[in-house]
């Protein structure tokens, strides 16, 4: 079926073996400082799902990240990047004095903003999006909604803990600044901030 074919590409039966962060790389994670918030049981449960752990084997820079590093730092995984983005969401929420519930939703949106990425990230997305008629944003929504049984552990957590439509609205950039939506929708958003930082590290800046 189409869903099974999509899952094969998503989970990596076709190309995941080409995109692996080696164990030696994982020993020295380039994640943001100030990550105490991630120790919260809810965030831990999300990062321990098969849906999120899948991102551990996907390089942030895609095919470029599999080459020899140019600068002093290696490429990170999509999982590490997602934790960095969630960290930025937490720091901004704290600075803006958002309440605990809104902060929680912004951080979870940060963790899940790349949950639908294909192996090799943007390097193959153009091809696979045309082949499967779906991009990583739409795939992320399918995973969040529990449409793939193999990755359904994430949805089981979310449906009892958060407002899923609000999380998806944040990721679709449909939420206003009054509820923190600008940290995802502005031109210089938290995803872009960490992306620029990690790319700079990789090339030696």
Ranges and model annotations:
Residues 2-107, 116-205:
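Sequence-structural signature of the catalytic-core scaffold of metal-dependent phosphohydrolases
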């Amino acid at each position: 079926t189409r869903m099974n074919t999509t899952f094969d590409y998503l989970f990596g039966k076709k190309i995941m073996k080409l995109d692996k962060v080696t164990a030696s790389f994982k020993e020295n994670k380039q994640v943001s400082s100030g990550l105490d918030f991630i120790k919260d049981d809810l965030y831990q449960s999300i990062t321990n799902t098969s849906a999120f752990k899948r991102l551990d084997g996907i390089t942030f820079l895609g095919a470029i990240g599999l080459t020899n590093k140019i600068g002093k730092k290696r490429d990170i995984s999509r999982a590490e990047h997602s934790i960095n983005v969630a960290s930025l969401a937490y720091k901004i929420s704290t600075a803006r004095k958002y309440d605990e519930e809104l902060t929680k939703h912004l951080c979870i949106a940060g963790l899940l903003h790349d949950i639908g990425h294909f192996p090799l990230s943007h390097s193959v997305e153009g091809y696979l999006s045309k082949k499967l008629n779906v991009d990583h944003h739409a795939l992320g929504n399918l995973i969040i909604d529990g449409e793939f049984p193999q990755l359904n552990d994430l949805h089981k957590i979310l449906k009892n803990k958060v407002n899923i439509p609000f999380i998806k609205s944040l990721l679709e950039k449909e939420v206003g600044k009054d509820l923190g939506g600008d940290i995802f929708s502005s031109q210089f958003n938290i995803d872009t901030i960490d992306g620029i930082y990690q790319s700079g590290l990789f090339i030696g800046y």
